[in-house]
Amino acid sequence: MRRFLRTGHDPARERLKRDLFQFNKTVEHGFPHQPSALGYSPSLRILAIGTRSGAVKLYGAPGVEFMGLHKENNAVLQIHFLPGQCQLVTLLDDNSLHLWSLKVKGGVSELQEEESFTLRGPPGAAPSATQVTEILPHSSGELLYLGTESGNVFVVQLPGFRTLHDRTICSDEVLQWLPEEARHRRVFEMVEALQEHPRDPNQILIGYSRGLVVIWDLQGSRALSHFLSSQQLENASWQRDGCLIVTCHSDGSHCQWPVSSDTQNPEPLRSSIPYGPFPCKAITKIFWLTTRQGLPFTIFQGGMPRASYGDRHCISVVHNGQQTAFDFTSRVIDFTVLSEADPAAAFDDPYALVVLAEEELVVIDLQTPGWPPVQLPYLASLHCSAITCSHHVSNIPLKLWERIIAAGSRQNSHFSTMEWPIDGGTSLAPPPPQRDLLLTGHEDGTVRFWDASGVCLRLLYKLSTVRVFLTDTDPSENLIAQGEDEWPPLRKVGSFDPYSDDPRLGIQKIFLCKYSGYLAVAGTAGQVLVLELNDEAAEHAVEQVEADLLQDQEGYRWKGHERLAARPGPVCFEAGFQPFVLVQCQPPAVVTSLALHSEWRLVAFGTSHGFGLFDHQQRRQVFVKCTLHPSDQLALEGPLSRVKSLKKSLRQSFRRMRRSRVSSHKRRPGGPTGEAQAQAVNIKAERTGLQNMELAPVQRKIEARSAEDSFTGFVRTLYFADTYLRDSSRHCPSLWAGTNGGTVYAFSLRVPPAERRTDEPVRAEQAKEIQLMHRAPVVGILVLDGHNVPLPEPLEVAHDLSKSPDMQGSHQLLVVSEEQFKVFTLPKVSAKLKLKLTALEGSRVRRVGVAHFGSCRAEDYGEHHLAVLTNLGDIQVVSMPLLKPQVRYSCIRREDVSGIASCVFTKYGQGFYLISPSEFERFSLSTKWLVEPRCLVDSTKAKKHNRPSNGNGTGLKMTSSGHVRNSKSQSDGDEKKPGPVMEHALLNDAWVLKEIQSTLEGDRRSYGNWHPHRVAVGCRLSNGEAE
């Protein structure tokens, strides 16, 4: 009965927990999912992006970030900053207006929603009468002019959103000021443009969709002049001196109209169709910007020839005889031009073009000849190719960091040297305490290295593995330079490229040794590459070795995709990580596990068929081990023919549900009679399974799984350790492997000493085989030394960055399966402790990592614990080696299967997971390590808005990027409410990740359902937490 007794409450331990553990969701890295609106404040130099899920994100200088979330789950249609103020107005698709303010509290700025408003019409009026289409914040900062679908312009006073009905500009009133010939045409309908006169705040421009443009005198309530076009109006804007109006139209034309009090109905000075004479698409927005040199900039969106280029997403820039149509790979949401902010200035002098596309943000330098792009310090398009895996490395040595940055800088020669132009606000966060890397593998065979040290996730270097293989579309053979005379003058910009040359190139596993510079990557078609960092470009052949994982098996036939064909002969590689050996697994199945030991120069790899060990110093295979069970036919079908096993998959799913339901009833009686009754129940449940879809929730105790379940040989984890494997007197190198069927294999390795390492071969011999009784998949293996501390990383002791492991006391083996944790003594491998995670909750371990938790009070105190993520989205911290649960937090929605599958833990109690295809959510479990924005925006100290200078380097001077603070801890189960967090989407990842995850998920959840979801937070949102 002792095991049923609750342990006593220990106040000292509870206080220590508060010093060690605290859950926070801190910052979102990447590009906002499904952007829908763009805004910019010239006085604050802050950019705003709205999304379809109702989020508003503000960005200034690197490290200056804010986020707000509307209570309503509606798309943001427009964002407008109030001139000269720290306020902005948003328009949602439910026709509601919201006023936001940046207010200083506690020395930092917070984004708060002040009030909301919906324009109401008279009783019985049609909804279009008050449907807002255009918003003009007046320069006074006290009035909003709202154009509507009915053609009326309403005036709303701020603050308070009070409608001034006596100042409404009705379409009937405007009609009275038009000449007789214009009154007979349907010149109104909706308002398409509202612009204040750049020199006279008493005049506004009103543009109607039917082609009428009116200059309205606010004081005299009269039309000063009007302009009538024969084409439908899309947009209109002033020239800086107010003497010229530029309009753009639905036929792909734009016109210039002189503004004069003498002429009431002038003809356009100039009308042109830039990409005519054939029918063109509409020009939806246009800027006409003056310069000191005298030649203006004309920048417009759309207008491409409808027949040949109607599917292109282009923004054209015309200046001084040069014309370029910037071609984006995703739909353009909106754009703006950064120019001289002082209204009294004589010229616009534009210096940057900011384009918000559906999948990325692009900034073009308009000062430098050729108009090159500007490198982004944040808002990176993480999903330029679909993310398939991720890997985090903490505390990178300075030398390796500098070498990676140097290799990356050579890839950035096409970027402008302009300093980042959106530099509003001040980051108050201290410099990050260490250098961290986040590596992401992608579907197109690339690996991207990101600076994850602080708030800004910045791309440092991109590695491509494509050159190692021959693909159907070789980029080196298909690059066709565009001639100078080609029309239209298209130029591809941006990094988003959703198309992959070959899905087999996808990266599935990454392992980087930060001490030696060795990198191992593995892919979808069984390819394993070992790479070494080289500071110079080189040309060499990549040695190829085949690892046949089925060499001892007969009668198996692989039905999946073929292997990738390696490129023969020497290959040119740029500076950076260069591959020197390729290990090709046969069959070419997805590589499911990878481990690299740079001190022993060994790399281990596993698939659904087995695992192998390769000596990359001698370029030879050490051994392969087939883990297939005779029933693992599904493992041979491969991802491209998985649909063939649908019937078998459904049958196995119902068997699992049947066992779950039966186990929740009374215990099965013993003897033949009980077995017969149980068999009858099983048969009946299987027959009626398809009809009875309303099943009880899965609540089961741990039970042994059948050895005939599919994918029992699926290798889930690989682990190197120098420990006591054969006897307690001698320790030796070893390799451990855990499979989907609950089997753990241990191989003792004989690695020759350094002086004979190149001559003598590495030898391996199987020493142990452990079969877990419940046969749950093994997701983690760890060896603890005599002091119960995890063994250090390879070369960590040699670099004096870790103490030598205690080899005097007895070592312990920790095996983490999906359903329980178990500690074994070594070398006898006798069970010592265990923790059942899934007793009655149906939860299973999805991710596990070892983290060091430092105390926020005592600098020299810390503990090593396991960070565990379950399929329910909960994160638990479990002590080692006593396996005592410490805290538990709810982190990810249980429906977000792909978000759970993408989670990665760091060595210091932080983590990342994908909340959308383009965004990582960062969270922290530690009180000591917390990266969050802390910034200040002060309107009274607005910067002088000179154009950014062009200097040497990339201009990405990261003055601050994170904040490490100590804060009040949270008790278990009462975690801090997540603040401005967008858990609004699931990962729409590559088919490879879907296939692997669907294999691992017992309940066969559907990937097709995408249910947007938001965390309910208050209106008051700070840049780190909700209040």
From Swiss-Prot:
* PROSITE patterns noted in UniProt: WD_REPEATS_1, WD_REPEATS_2
Entry's InterPro entries?
Lethal2_giant (IPR000664), LLGL2 (IPR013577), WD40/YVTN_repeat-like_dom_sf (IPR015943), WD40_repeat_dom_sf (IPR036322), WD40_rpt (IPR001680)
Query: Keywords on this record?
Result: Cell cycle, Cell division, Cytoplasm, Exocytosis, Phosphoprotein, Repeat, WD repeat
Compartments in which it is found:
Cytoplasm
Q: Which GO terms describe its molecular function?
A: PDZ domain binding
GO cellular component term of the entry, any: intracellular membrane-bounded organelle
Q: Does the keyword NAD apply?
A: no
Q: Where is the composition biased (Polar residues)?
A: 957-970
Q: Where is the composition biased (Basic residues)?
A: 654-669
Region annotation (Disordered) maps to 654-678, 940-981
Q: Which residues carry this modification: Phosphoserine?
A: S653, S971, S1022
Q: How is it modified after translation?
A: Phosphorylated at Ser-653 by PRKCI. Phosphorylation is enhanced during cell polarization induced by calcium. Phosphorylation may occur during the cell-cell contact-induced cell polarization and may contribute to the segregation of LLGL2 from the PRKCI/aPKC and PARD6B/Par-6 complex.
Gene3D superfamilies found in the cross-reference section: YVTN repeat-like/Quinoprotein amine dehydrogenase
Where is it chiefly localized? Answer: cytoplasm
WD repeat start-end pairs: 36-69, 76-117, 132-169, 193-227, 233-268, 282-324, 332-366, 388-464, 508-583, 592-653, 715-771, 780-832, 837-890, 904-927
Which GO biological-process labels does this protein carry? Answer: branching involved in labyrinthine layer morphogenesis; cell division; establishment or maintenance of polarity of embryonic epithelium; exocytosis; L-leucine transport; labyrinthine layer blood vessel development; multicellular organism growth; placenta development
PANTHER family tied to this protein: LETHAL 2 GIANT LARVAE PROTEIN, LLGL SCRIBBLE CELL POLARITY COMPLEX COMPONENT 2
**Role noted for this protein:** Part of a complex with GPSM2/LGN, PRKCI/aPKC and PARD6B/Par-6, which may ensure the correct organization and orientation of bipolar spindles for normal cell division. This complex plays roles in the initial phase of the establishment of epithelial cell polarity.
Query: Subunit notes for this chain?
Result: Interacts with GPSM2/LGN, PRKCI/aPKC and PARD6B/Par-6. The complex is enhanced during mitosis. Interacts with DCAF1.
The entry assigns this protein to a family as follows: Belongs to the WD repeat L(2)GL family.
Name of protein: LLGL scribble cell polarity complex component 2
